[in-house]
Amino acid sequence: MELLIKAFIMGIVEGLTEFLPISSTGHLIIVGKFIHFTGNFATMFEIVIQLGAILAVVFYYRKKIFASLKNLKPGSWGFNLWFKIFIAFIPAAVIGLLTHKYIEEHLFSPFTVAIALIAGAIMMIVIEDTFGKRYKIDNMDKVDTKKSLLIGIAQVMSLFPGMSRSASTIMGGMLAGLSVKAAAEFSFFLAIPTMFAATTLSLLKGFSAMSLLEWQALAVGFITSFLTALFVVDKFLPYLTRHSLKPFAYYRLAVGVLMILLVAEKIVK
């Protein structure tokens, strides 16, 4: 029962943070430390429940996704959409495959997460102040291949735990001339292949070794993350049409500084 409660908590954390620019991985690491949810299963669990969150995006955009898949002839709207998503997916996929083992062994710690949270917060503030009002693209369908590649390169930053995939791609979109809303929507679509790939890699490494209780915990986390993420996606895009990203940046700064203090006092290791 204790494991299932922890899975429920982690599912809520994943769903709340996956599509906000505050780092789901960073929060999962931090919360996992506090509730003593760590180890090999926890590491895989944290990646696999992302599938629940990404399915929330698939469900939310189901009409647009199904419409795009009906016509994938070269030159069609559907083909162009997924080609641009594929181009943006490549940089993080390649570098992630080459570095994932090192990242898992050396960078999954509260201190590194804190540094990434703070660095990402500063970048968000600077980029929004510099490029936030200069956008020329207010619809993700108008993004071209070069801009897709720029967003994909920006996504590489998210390989560092605590940086946030959502924050990285939204910042990349703003640098490419997209509005915050268009950048966020592109980020949601880019999350589909990116997170499916990360989940598949994790499954191949350790899925068969799970016990019945661990399977149950995974199901609880999956369902919880799906429902929570669906709520967040529904509210986040409308929020971006009226508000700034800075509240998320300030939150990141506060959490990052707090984590450094907790690590310094050896309350969290």
UniProtKB/Swiss-Prot annotation:
Its localization reads: Cell membrane
Pfam families given for it? BacA
Q: What is this protein called?
A: Undecaprenyl-diphosphatase
**A cellular component annotation (GO) from this entry:** plasma membrane
What residue ranges are annotated as transmembrane?
Answer: 3-23, 41-61, 78-98, 107-127, 148-167, 184-204, 213-233, 248-268
In terms of superkingdom, the source organism counts as: Bacteria
**Where mainly found?**
membrane
Q: Which organism is it from?
A: Thermoanaerobacter sp. (strain X514)
The way it spans or sits in the membrane comes to: Multi-pass membrane protein
Q: Which HAMAP family match?
A: Undec_diphosphatase (MF_01006)
Which reactions does this protein catalyse? di-trans,octa-cis-undecaprenyl diphosphate + H2O = di-trans,octa-cis-undecaprenyl phosphate + phosphate + H(+)
Q: Name one GO biological process term.
A: cell wall organization
- What molecular function does GO assign, one term? undecaprenyl-diphosphatase activity
